[in-house]
Amino acid sequence: MRQKLRGIIPNLATSIGTSAEANAPGALALGGSSEASKKFSIAEGYLASSDGYGAIAIGSAAKIKQLEKGTINHIVGNDNKGLYVDADGNVTKITVRTESEKDILSRYGQTYGAVALGFRSSSHNLFASSFGAFSTATAIESLAVGDSSQSTGYRSATFGSHSRALAEESLALGYETRANAYGSVALGAESVANEENTVSVGSDTLKRKIVNVADGTEDL
């Protein structure tokens, strides 16, 4: 077990475990080969890695990191501009929706406030959160909950094992659901939503009925 304390009390960096590394003020690495490399970041678990300001990675091989260098990612916004990460791992082009997002990115970096919880879970963007084994959240303010779930659209959310929210502000609820279009909602196991701003309760091959719906309050 190894513990490293650096600087004055408010800026302690602490690492506990074989080859654990805490390399920034306020960082905490707990577990064998864990690494917390940004201010106030936390990495807990074997091979856990947290590379975002104030980011939290908990679980064996859980990971918070910027997207790989040299990759182009078309997941931020529906204008397909996406972001580009240069050879040094720096974001050189990114589509953001608010001035506050732009300010946070410039001040603290791409993975500020990200959270990954679960075996090999990973989050790769501003306020992205993933919960569950192999879950992944890659877009700004995206949320993935459930094993092998994936949220790649700006402000998208997915809940359920193997569910996918792939478009901006899309929502997938249920096992193996797919929300593939802007503002779409896929509701119920294996439902697929392929059209913008629509709610799907099934797919081309899976049909469902919506029952027990009350009358509306106004006549048209």
List the predicted regions and their residue ranges:
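Small/polar residue-rich beta-strand/coil "junction" motifs that cap repeat-based extracellular fibers
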Residues: 1-19, 23-134, 138-220
